[in-house]
Amino acid sequence: MRTSPRRPLILKRRRLPLPVQNAPSETSEEEAKRSPAQPEPAPAQASQEVAESSSCKFPAGIKIINHPTTPNTQVVAIPSNADIQSIITALTAKGKESGTSGPNRFILISSGGPSSHPSQPQAHSSRDSKRAEVITETLGPKPAAKGVPVPKPPGAPPRQRQESYAGGEAAGCTLDNSLTNIQWLGKMSSDGLGPCSVKQELEEKENCHLEQNRVKVEEPSGVSTSWQDSVSERPPYSYMAMIQFAINSTERKRMTLKDIYTWIEDHFPYFKHIAKPGWKNSIRHNLSLHDMFVRETSANGKVSFWTIHPSANRHLTLDQVFKPLEPGSPQSPEHLESQQKRPNPELHRNVTIKTEIPLGARRKMKPLLPRVSSYLEPIQFPVNQSLVLQPSVKVPFRLAASLMSSELARHSKRVRIAPKVLLSSEGIAPLPATEPPKEEKPLLGGEGLLPLLPIQSIKEEEMQPEEDIAHLERPIKVESPPLEEWPSPCASLKEELSNSWEDSSCSPTPKPKKSYCGLKSPTRCVSEMLVTKRREKREVSRSRRKQHLQPPCLDEPDLFFPEDSSTFRPAVELLAESSEPAPHLSCPQEEGGPFKTPIKETLPVSSTPSKSVLSRDPESWRLTPPAKVGGLDFSPVRTPQGAFGLLPDSLGLMELNTTPLKSGPLFDSPRELLNSEPFDLASDPFGSPPPPHVEGPKPGSPELQIPSLSANRSLTEGLVLDTMNDSLSKILLDISFPGLEEDPLGPDNINWSQFIPELR
């Protein structure tokens, strides 16, 4: 302890009695100076009892919710008009009061109040995030657990600053006397401390030193012999200037190297007693570096002299630069010129001291404890309170989606893949694993073109033996119409979806080839289906890259349709019967072998095997496909039976999403919208049941898809207040609400034009 002079000093300072009487007025005064528009903190913050009881005296709009996954963590939703400093103080007192048994980590998020304009809560949210940034930046190494930030007015004397520090600590919480809590180190300054018996002489020396510096700044004329008489202070001149002083002090304006050393040591005692011997190397370096110093040799060639080149010699002497002046006389021009040309480092140091000491909060220290960086923390609120959080526009949807998908992939075995939407009106489609068959004429003439039918959605339900034989005898070729004829209702999302989702498995579609393939016998189909299902279960466990690189099927299947259109059942019944064995459309490989890759739907977007998507009502199908009793189900994601009703979709968009994550229904009310967890339409981890029936969007309304993308991924910024290690971190929160009573996030109340530029 004795070898380190600072540690006993700091320990002694730490145990000083801290005056609290002026703390409330100081705090409110400084708060008024910092931001006159914000409400002043209550004077009752100065006492610990009020701070402890303020945990139940939060403003009306604050809601505290237990975090569903992290223990001892609570989420605090703060309205935009609340006083953040008093809330942080109350939360700190609450965390200190509960200790390790109760909640000691709080996530602060901003929630907008009731507003008639949709853009106004967004302004509140951005203002709150800016205020949170101000708090984190102002605190520096002293986190928010110690209470409010205490910026100092520039003219505050040291004693007032010490009292304001003490007031901030007393208002925040009870002082922690533990030696492991070193957050208060950043608040210590070298002056303005109370009496200390152990290190009294050291503090007096520091204070005298500061007073000397202030005198030198304010009265340069009275500084005549301070540094010259002082051994411990380095002279404020460069080596080049001191060499000029030494050479010009002689009559012949020349001097040997040894004489230069001697002259500097005589006139500047610092170099003789304090400085390390390396300063002589600096002298030699400057002599050889600058061209103004010329080396001359004596007549006999034994002695070398250093002189100054006549054209560069300004005849500077120490008497010109450093001359004792009378206390009221003006300074000489040489003195002013030298002071301007060679700035005094002592003066600069004093100026910085005078600016930094009053502004103690601006002093930056490297944090001694590790700090938590920004991260995404998924939160699902299992409550029925009407809690409105403003989504942050600062976080792009694509970045958050990629971060969230990587987080899910890292923590679970079931990988959720983002839904991929087919591009329209450009003729560019992802490369299918099996090329689509062609159709030369519509099956039902006069009813229009056949929509794009997925192969696995064609179910064989009831086929008469006569029709079976007739269709086996004459195969029919099916041609998918060109992509230009099928407009997409999400044309506004075309560019960003193509940028974010077509990187993995997208390339121009090659020309489909014609091929012929017949249906096998039922027993052969059942055996092939079982073999293929086992093989596909093994292949699902592999990576997507290996599936993508697998060679496609050599022969393409043809589609067979019955002549009557009476066999149609809803997709929910077909999904319920998907576990029964049934004949299946198969593609023989090398004359009869089972195929390796499952038959994809028409124009698949990825190489991941997928199950059939939802079918449509008879009016939009224009013909009834023969539904088979059961089909291969390769999807790693199980769709809940009866989760969705039939989606009226006459544009064929739902059949083009072939990833395991189905393009779910687009909701009309926020309860249905918020019941769906981001990237998980199939399961609700908190047990909220899915809606029994959900209406789909009307065709040609692209705005209804943007709420489903952005409101499901409502990202907001928050702060994490950890009262155990006194840290305040800024995080991004991924929030979804399963149980909202009101309808604040509906499409009518939210201006979705704020989210469209961020998506692009």
From Swiss-Prot:
Residues of the DNA-binding region: 233-325
Keyword Iron: no
Stretches for region Disordered: 1-54, 95-167, 323-348, 500-560, 577-635, 660-709
Modified-residue entries (Phosphoserine), positions: 329, 374, 521, 727, 736
Chain positions found as Phosphothreonine: 608, 624
Swiss-Prot/TrEMBL keywords: Activator, Cell cycle, DNA damage, DNA repair, DNA-binding, Isopeptide bond, Nucleus, Phosphoprotein, Transcription, Transcription regulation, Ubl conjugation
Compositional bias per record (Polar residues), positions renumbered to this chain: 604-613
Location, primary (coarse class): nucleus
Cellular compartments annotated: Nucleus
GO molecular function: DNA binding; DNA-binding transcription factor activity; transcription cis-regulatory region binding
Cross-linked sites for Glycyl lysine isopeptide (Lys-Gly) (interchain with G-Cter in SUMO2): 199, 323, 354, 420, 438
PROSITE patterns: FORK_HEAD_1, FORK_HEAD_2, FORK_HEAD_3
Tissue note: Expressed in fetal heart, brain, liver, lung, kidney and limb, but only in adult thymus. Appears to be expressed only in adult organs containing proliferating/cycling cells or in response to growth factors.
Gene Ontology terms: cellular component: nucleus
InterPro entries in the cross-refs: FH_FOXM1, Fork_head_dom, FOXM1, TF_fork_head_CS_1, TF_fork_head_CS_2, WH-like_DNA-bd_sf, WH_DNA-bd_sf
GO biological process: cell population proliferation; DNA damage response, signal transduction by p53 class mediator; DNA repair; G2/M transition of mitotic cell cycle; liver development; positive regulation of DNA-templated transcription; positive regulation of double-strand break repair; positive regulation of stem cell proliferation
Pfam families: Forkhead (PF00250)
Low complexity composition bias: residue spans: 43-54, 110-124, 140-149
Post-translational modification (record): Phosphorylated in M (mitotic) phase. Phosphorylation by the checkpoint kinase CHEK2 in response to DNA damage increases the FOXM1 protein stability probably stimulating the transcription of genes involved in DNA repair. Phosphorylated by CDK1 in late S and G2 phases, creating docking sites for the POLO box domains of PLK1. Subsequently, PLK1 binds and phosphorylates FOXM1, leading to activation of transcriptional activity and subsequent enhanced expression of key mitotic regulators. Phosphorylated by GSK3B leading to ubiquitination and proteasomal degradation.
SMART domains reported for this sequence: FH
Domain of life where this protein originates: Eukaryota
Biased composition (Basic and acidic residues): 125-134, 334-348, 531-542
Function, in words: Transcription factor regulating the expression of cell cycle genes essential for DNA replication and mitosis. Plays a role in the control of cell proliferation. Also plays a role in DNA break repair, participating in the DNA damage checkpoint response. Promotes transcription of PHB2.
Record protein name field: Forkhead box protein M1
Species of the source: Mus musculus
Gene transcribed to yield this protein: Foxm1
